[in-house]
UniProtKB/Swiss-Prot annotation:
Substrate binds at R9, R10, D11, Y12, K67, Y124, R128, S132, R192, L193, H194. InterPro entries: Pyridox_Oxase, Pyridox_Oxase_CS, Pyridox_Oxase_N, Pyridoxamine_oxidase_dimer_C, Split_barrel_FMN-bd. Belongs to the pyridoxamine 5'-phosphate oxidase family. This is Pyridoxine/pyridoxamine 5'-phosphate oxidase. Catalyzes the oxidation of either pyridoxine 5'-phosphate (PNP) or pyridoxamine 5'-phosphate (PMP) into pyridoxal 5'-phosphate (PLP). Pfam families: PNP_phzG_C, PNPOx_N. Pathway: Cofactor metabolism; pyridoxal 5'-phosphate salvage; pyridoxal 5'-phosphate from pyridoxamine 5'-phosphate: step 1/1; Cofactor metabolism; pyridoxal 5'-phosphate salvage; pyridoxal 5'-phosphate from pyridoxine 5'-phosphate: step 1/1. Keywords: Flavoprotein, FMN, Oxidoreductase, Pyridoxine biosynthesis. The gene is pdxH.
Amino acid sequence: MNYDIADLRRDYAGETLSVESAPASPLDLFQTWFAAAREHETQDANAMTLATVDSQGLPHARVVLLKQLDDKGLVFFTNYQSHKGSELTNVPYAALVFWWPTLQRQIRIEGRVEKASAEVSDAYFANRPRDSQLGAWISQQSVEIPDRDWLEERKQRFEQVYGEQTVERPPHWGGYRVLPFLLEFWQGQPNRLHDRIRYRYHEQDAAWSKTRLAP
């Protein structure tokens, strides 16, 4: 199978991004860009690629949804017993990528990862649709299963178990917070002369530095 995709390209012409105009905190710039993405992207502005590594150093990536953002970092929720959960237990670092094609913008993030508090996970779980709450019990994420009937049978079983009762959060399900130490903002520009601004966190000074990178 051979696809000729060498000619797949587009022109870029976004807003100018400079070190001088960028705020001191990258999370402030992230919030500004994220608000614009929510306004202009057709759907899933909070979708982000999450990359982790296993115990052998092999990378694995998948798309997850950003569900909370605060001064500490970015939060997503998942099954702690999944492949990514196991990888984050062994190597508690991750990379994130947001891509917003309408705005011609990308944000790349690297950071340390910690579990969100039980209070944060409980509060988010309580606001999920009931079917999604049950799904957290039904699916043994990343485990090989024989067929879809296996899922449907577990669905019926848990619906009977809970009936009209409140569905509690499973102990194996909850949030992770990515604590960034690097953020890179990319803005598409004409002639492939794109704008790239990189922030690094310096723990000793408890401060961010920012610099411009060649495209």
